[in-house]
From Swiss-Prot:
Protein name per Swiss-Prot or TrEMBL: Low affinity sulfate transporter 3
Domain STAS, residue spans: 511-635
Keywords for the protein's UniProt record, in alphabetical order: Membrane, Transmembrane, Transmembrane helix, Transport
Gene Ontology CC, one term: membrane
Protein's job: Low-affinity H(+)/sulfate cotransporter which may be involved in the internal transport of sulfate between cellular or subcellular compartments within the plant.
Pfam families tied to this protein: STAS, Sulfate_transp
Family: Belongs to the SLC26A/SulP transporter (TC 2.A.53) family.
């Protein structure tokens, strides 16, 4: 086959060759920051820019002017309903985090108010959650023993909360939300399910009234600890009372029944919301009247009341554990953000509005920073409480403020009434909330759609269940990264054919009716990048196709011999030096076989780099086309090659 014709190539090809230079590297990295709504505004006046900035920072300013008494009535009802669920759950989650009960209540006061001012979700309910509480109780004790040094443990938790808030704020300001996406939906489903089972097993301590328990979180260690502790307390002289189990199981059945009724009949949405508070009131009254604490029933005892005390002086910012606090804070920040954004977006989709992920990160970060200064630990959006808030008919984030005020009144007026609350009730409240964290239906859906995603789901589940939270997260992230890496080093390289009666060229494997052109091999690289990781694979794959094509058509001589390779680069957004080198080597090997090479629709960054590397000059500018159809037509009309 002779070389390509030298006639002037079409104007459409010039559009590709003369496209503007892509943005510089600095703009690519700093562009998202400059585009951040918190720092830019199209307004010309400084006053208007200031108002726009405040409206972006505090979304409440954009809707408070249209807030009505009718909306407040709905938010008031939602907030009170939310508080009835939040108060007992907050106490239980504080116990799960190995903190005194009041710290769970503190966490339901300040963070919800900050979020109501800065958050963009109307339905999300803020406060302590089970997964983050367990995360802290499994990671922080590895640094400081909560039993031997309770004050230092509590102070380290506040420091972790500060770092979590700082990381979350940085993610929002720098628009780094993609970091949260590394924990995929499938991995999150597995992680939540594994965490729910581990949390449930840990509640056996309170449900059975055990005094000795393991600090490990894996299922095997917890079950072993339950057996040995229970056997030791029953056979030894220690006073073990089955009343803890009786009280806990009785109210657990009541809570699960209330949850079942509320799910079956939406008119009774309020029943599972008030059931935990009702359980606390009834069980406390029963223990008080029967003097159950004198008969072995473990009770909460003293709960400190009053407004959140300052914890600024308790932060450990210059001690030996700052590094560990930052590490745990980063993990907590990502887990908390992932759960909150997933919850917020699911309900925003139901209501038909957009949830700004970066604003959510900023709001979450600011509320946790404020929380760390006011004796709170890491808070986020709770799925169970958000569902209750939604079902109660909330209209805005004011329901969070109503809930916070109600919890504050509880702290001021009613904490002394919690003295006789049995620990088994806290365990039963947490256990009743766990079924919502296990989504078997979604896991089955993941299995049907993507087996690799299901592997990440299983990895996170079994890692959390049988090893630890960190290992479960590490396994999930490793599988997710392996999936990304596998897709990067083994990109799709497809042979294209023309769909009859159209100008469309599609994968012949997917569309068997697609017709290939004799002597012309059209190939598409279905990858975002041609780089060092996959360039060799792409080069060898194309050469293998040329050899296979020639071998299959050896009896047809010139008619079957490949005369031209057309590479469709429409999907290719970037190429590095290794990718360019692979293209040059491919071009040389094709020339040695008498095969010409052409490119179709290289994106602007790709064509810019190919021109700078002189690759376009090497293959000839007339071999760059806008569409596959134009490239094939040029070949057939002898612009590309003389007919055999």
């Amino acid at each position: 086959m002779s070389s390509l014709g030298t006639e002037q190539f079409s104007e459409r090809s010039q559009w590709v060759l003369n496209s503007p230079n892509p943005p510089p590297l600095t703009k690519k990295f700093l562009g998202p920051l400059k585009d951040n709504k918190f720092f830019t505004s199209s307004s010309s006046k400084k006053e208007t820019r200031a108002v726009s900035f405040l409206a972006s920072l505090f979304p409440i300013l954009s809707w408070i002017r249209t807030y009505s008494a009718t909306k407040f009535k709905d938010d008031l009802l939602s907030g009170l309903t939310l508080a009835s669920l939040s108060i007992p759950q907050s106490i239980g989650y504080a116990n799960l985090a190995k903190l005194d009960p009041q710290y769970g209540l503190y966490t339901s006061v300040i963070p919800p108010v900050i979020y109501a001012l800065m958050g963009s979700s109307r339905e999300i309910a803020i406060g302590p959650v089970a997964v983050v509480s367990m995360l802290l109780s499994s990671l922080v004790p590895k640094v400081i023993d909560p039993d031997a040094h309770p004050n230092d443990y509590r102070n380290l938790v506040f420091t972790v909360t500060l770092f979590a808030g700082i990381f979350q704020t940085a993610f929002g300001v720098l628009r780094l939300g993609f970091l949260v996406d590394f924990l995929s939906h499938a991995a999150l489903v597995g992680f939540m399910a594994g965490a729910a089972i581990v949390i449930g097993l840990q509640q056996l301590k309170g449900l059975l009234g055990l005094t000795h328990f393991t600090t490990k979180t894996d299922a095997v260690a917890v079950l072993k600890s339950v057996y040995t502790s229970l056997h030791q307390q029953i056979t030894s002289s220690e006073n073990w009372s089955p009343l803890n189990f009786v009280i806990g199981c009785s109210f657990l059945i009541f809570l699960l029944a209330a949850r079942f009724i509320g799910r079956r009949n939406k008119k009774f949405f309020w029943l599972p919301a008030i059931a935990p508070l009702l359980s606390v009131i009834l069980s406390t009254l029963i223990v008080f009247l029967s003097k159950g604490d004198k008969h072995g029933v473990n009770i909460i005892k003293h709960v400190q009341g009053g407004l959140n005390p300052s914890s600024v002086h308790k932060l450990q910012l210059n001690g030996p554990h700052v590094g560990q606090a930052a590490k745990i804070g980063l993990i907590s920040a990502i887990i908390a953000l992932t759960e909150a954004i997933a919850v917020g977006r699911s309900f925003a989709n139901i209501k038909g509005y957009h949830l700004d992920g970066n604003k959510e990160m900023l709001a979450m970060g600011c509320m946790n920073i404020a929380g760390s200064l006011t004796s709170c630990y890491v808070s986020t959006g709770s799925f169970s409480r958000t569902a209750v808030n939604f079902s109660a008919g909330c209209k805005t984030a004011v329901s969070n403020i109503v809930m916070a005020v109600t919890v504050l009144l509880c702290l001021e007026l009613f904490t002394r009434l919690l003295y006789y609350t049995p620990m088994a009730i806290l365990a039963s409240i947490i256990l009743s909330a766990l079924p919502g964290l296990i989504d078997i239906g979604e896991a089955y859906h993941i299995w049907k759609v993507d087996k690799f995603d299901f592997l990440a789901c299983l990895g996170a589940f079994f890692g959390v269940l049988f090893v630890s939270i960190e290992i479960g997260l590490l396994i999930a992230l490793s599988i997710s990264f392996a999936k990304i890496l596998l897709q990067a080093i083994r990109p799709g390289v497809e042979v294209l054919g023309r769909i009859p009666t159209t100008e469309a060229y599609c994968d012949v494997a997917q569309y068997p009716m697609a017709v290939t052109t004799p002597g012309i091999l059209v190939i598409r690289i279905s990858s975002g990048s041609l780089c060092f990781a996959n360039a060799g694979f792409v080069r060898e794959r194309i050469l293998k196709w040329v050899e296979d094509e020639e071998q299959d058509n050896i009896e047809e001589a010139a008619k079957g011999r490949v005369q031209a390779i057309i590479i469709d680069m429409t999907d290719l957004t970037n190429v590095d030096t290794s990718g360019i080198l692979a293209l040059e080597e491919l071009h040389k090997k094709l020339l040695s076989r008498g095969v010409e090479l052409a490119m179709v629709n290289p994106r602007w960054e790709v064509i810019h780099k190919l021109k700078v590397a002189n690759f376009v000059d090497k293959i000839g500018k007339e071999r760059v086309f806008l569409t596959v159809a134009e490239a094939v037509d040029a070949c057939l009309s002898s612009r590309f090659a003389n007919s055999a």
